[in-house]
């Protein structure tokens, strides 16, 4: 899973589900239990940080409290990083206020006058993990996971998280978690020493009992600097990490070197000085343009799931529906195993017995290859196979909610589908959508993006089911209207390159700039015509579908970084070469007149 992969359902606490005060407290047998009930999956924003600071202060001052336990409502202890950076723009960057507040809170937790235990469940991410590492002890549900996504987003972990991780585990294990592309289980050998495991059903009682035990026996409080005991091994891990880095890092990777400097400071400096050193680097990384670009794309990934159809229907009704699929053997081998692994019941259908047998055999061969390569166990393969069936005709008694067909199967399958069964067209590379709802993956061997091409009056539930299907295929779904945005954006960039190569003269601006301008201008047209919903969708389209560098944020974000007045001026210069490609779109003129940016349309 990449930094921009479709996020799994976080079950965030929103609206009435989030407590007004964000932190609830009850005291039982001398243990104060503080429960985070913050918005958006308990992400550590300024309000939640302030509420926690008040809650801890009150518990520490209460003579009837001997120990403190911190837990959380909802499916996650902390679902992710708080969105604290503004969109890319030419405005001078500001240090987010929450950085200092979280660091101060973690310092107070680390100096708690009473034993403080964190009871962890679900995802323990970013600021939530920094809080946990500052506590005296952690008690985790065996299904809990931990992650600092910041190193993959141009930043450093907040709240002294990298330091405390190294202090507890040593440099090698700390780097395993810091460099992990996805959350690690608390049972992972690298981080298992952090946690006392407890069954989920008994997590809170176990944490309360452990906190009370530590109050009675403070000598049992885990050593906060155990990871520094083997100094040669610590230094060796840092040497290996530095040896694996380029001698000269580009600007968007400077935070990687800073992270190693912080881990080195964890060993060489007194704790207070190391924390101050870390804080400077955390703030510096947050000010970088690449950090803002990564943050923009993270928001774009979540925002892309909000569509007119998602507002009109309940996503829950789009889940867990059996799928009828009429696919070529190659396409079935590509798509069906992942759907089966995700629990989808799939019925493959074909008019020809031989063709159906060939398609089923293609899926079986892919399963065998996955078992042989270690990507799946034999038991899992056999379990998945129970969810697959084949038919030569429709079963009127068991009509699926959704049918998926490749182009060759559209006509005959559509003619036989009963009323109420929606068909989605899987558009192969270069094809055109032929249904009310079509799925068009990005043209790549392993696509990360799938456009949901929606025609006029397409049923909202069908769009949602198609979006859910794309996510189950581990593709980021992007809703577009009537035609592919990616195809037009790629065509604009290619056309700009061709114009420059065949012109026989020096372009008015550097070639790369000319291609960027053409892409931005095409994106503006797609927004004006209603093909794309928002500028961030276009950025996500180019990053996931065309290899646009993530650290640049996407073409529309770059347009905002340039500034629309400068953008219009440069487009007018470029239009002398090709007016159709570079004449500023009217949307750009409208935004300038209103004093807006592309980001204001997100």
Predicted regions mapped to residue ranges:
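Internal alpha-helical scaffold of NAD(P)-dependent oxidoreductase catalytic cores
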Residues: 184, 342-344, 450-482, 490-506, ...
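Glycine- (often His-adjacent) and acidic-residue-rich active-site loop
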Residues: 72-105, 152-155
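Glycine-rich beta-to-alpha active-site loop
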Residues: 103, 108-153, 157, 327-332
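Gly/Pro- and small hydrophobic-enriched strand-loop and loop-to-helix capping segments
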Residues: 136-158, 193-207, 347-353
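Conserved CoA-thioester-binding segment of acyl-CoA-metabolizing enzymes
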Residues: 1-73
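Rossmann-fold NAD(P)-binding glycine/threonine-rich loop
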Residues: 409-467
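Intrinsically disordered, low-complexity segments enriched in small/flexible residues
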Residues: 2-18, 35, 49, 69-71, ...
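Conserved Rossmann-fold dehydrogenase catalytic segment
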Residues: 199-200, 222-227, 435, 442-448, ...
């Amino acid at each position: 899973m990449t930094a921009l992969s479709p996020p799994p359902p976080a079950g965030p606490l929103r609206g009435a589900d989030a407590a007004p005060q964000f932190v609830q407290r009850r005291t039982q047998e001398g243990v104060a239990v503080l429960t985070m009930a913050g918005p958006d999956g308990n992400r550590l924003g300024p309000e939640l940080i302030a509420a926690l600071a008040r809650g801890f202060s009150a518990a520490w001052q209460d003579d009837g409290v001997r120990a403190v336990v911190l837990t959380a409502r909802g499916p996650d202890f902390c679902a992710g990083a708080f969105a604290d950076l503004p969109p890319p723009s030419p405005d001078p960057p500001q240090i987010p206020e929450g950085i200092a507040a979280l660091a101060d809170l973690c310092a107070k937790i680390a100096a708690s006058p009473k034993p403080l235990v964190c009871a962890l469940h679900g995802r323990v991410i970013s600021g939530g993990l920094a809080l946990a590492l500052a506590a005296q002890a952690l008690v985790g549900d065996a299904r809990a996971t931990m992650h600092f996504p910041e190193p993959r987003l141009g930043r450093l972990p907040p709240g002294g998280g990298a330091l405390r991780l190294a202090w507890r585990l040593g440099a090698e294990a700390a780097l395993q978690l810091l460099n992990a592309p996805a959350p690690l289980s608390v049972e992972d050998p690298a981080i298992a020493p952090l946690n006392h495991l407890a069954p989920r059903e008994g997590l809170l009682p176990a944490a309360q009992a452990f906190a009370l035990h530590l109050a009675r026996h403070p000598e049992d409080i885990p050593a906060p600097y155990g990871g520094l005991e083997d100094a040669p091994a610590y230094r060796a891990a840092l040497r290996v990490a530095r040896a694996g880095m380029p001698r000269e890092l580009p600007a968007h990777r400077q935070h990687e070197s800073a992270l190693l400097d912080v881990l080195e400071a964890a060993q060489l400096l007194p704790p207070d000085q190391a924390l101050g050193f870390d804080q400077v680097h955390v703030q510096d990384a947050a000010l970088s343009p690449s950090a803002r670009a990564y943050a923009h794309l993270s928001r774009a990934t979540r925002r892309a799931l909000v569509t007119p159809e998602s507002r009109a229907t309940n996503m829950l009704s789009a889940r867990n529906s059996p799928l009828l699929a009429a696919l070529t053997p190659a396409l079935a081998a590509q798509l069906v195993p992942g759907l089966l692994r995700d629990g989808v019941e799939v019925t493959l259908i074909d008019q020809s017995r031989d063709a159906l047998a060939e398609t089923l055999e293609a899926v079986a061969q892919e399963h065998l290859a996955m078992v042989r390569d270690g990507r799946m166990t034999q038991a899992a393969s056999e379990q998945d196979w129970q969810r697959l069936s084949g038919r030569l005709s429709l079963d009127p008694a068991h009509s699926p909610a959704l049918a998926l067909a490749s182009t060759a199967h559209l006509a005959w399958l559509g003619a036989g589908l009963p009323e109420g069964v929606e068909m989605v067209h899987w558009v192969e590379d270069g094809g055109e959508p032929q249904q009310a709802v079509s799925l068009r993956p990005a043209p790549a061997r392993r696509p990360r993006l799938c456009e949901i091409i929606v025609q006029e009056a397409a049923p909202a539930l069908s769009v949602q089911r198609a979006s859910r299907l794309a996510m189950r295929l581990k593709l980021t779904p992007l809703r577009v209207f009537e035609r592919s945005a990616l195809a037009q954006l790629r065509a604009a960039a290619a056309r700009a390159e061709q114009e420059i190569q065949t012109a026989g003269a020096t372009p008015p601006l550097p070639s790369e700039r000319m291609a960027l301008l053409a892409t931005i201008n095409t994106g503006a047209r797609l927004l004006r015509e209603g093909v794309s919903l928002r500028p961030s969708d276009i950025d996500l389209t180019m990053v996931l579908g065309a290899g646009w560098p993530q650290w640049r944020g996407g073409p529309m974000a770059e347009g905002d970084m340039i500034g629309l007045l400068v953008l219009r001026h440069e487009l007018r210069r470029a239009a002398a070469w090709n007016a159709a490609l570079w004449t500023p779109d009217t949307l750009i003129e409208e935004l300038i007149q209103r004093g807006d940016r592309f980001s204001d349309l997100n």
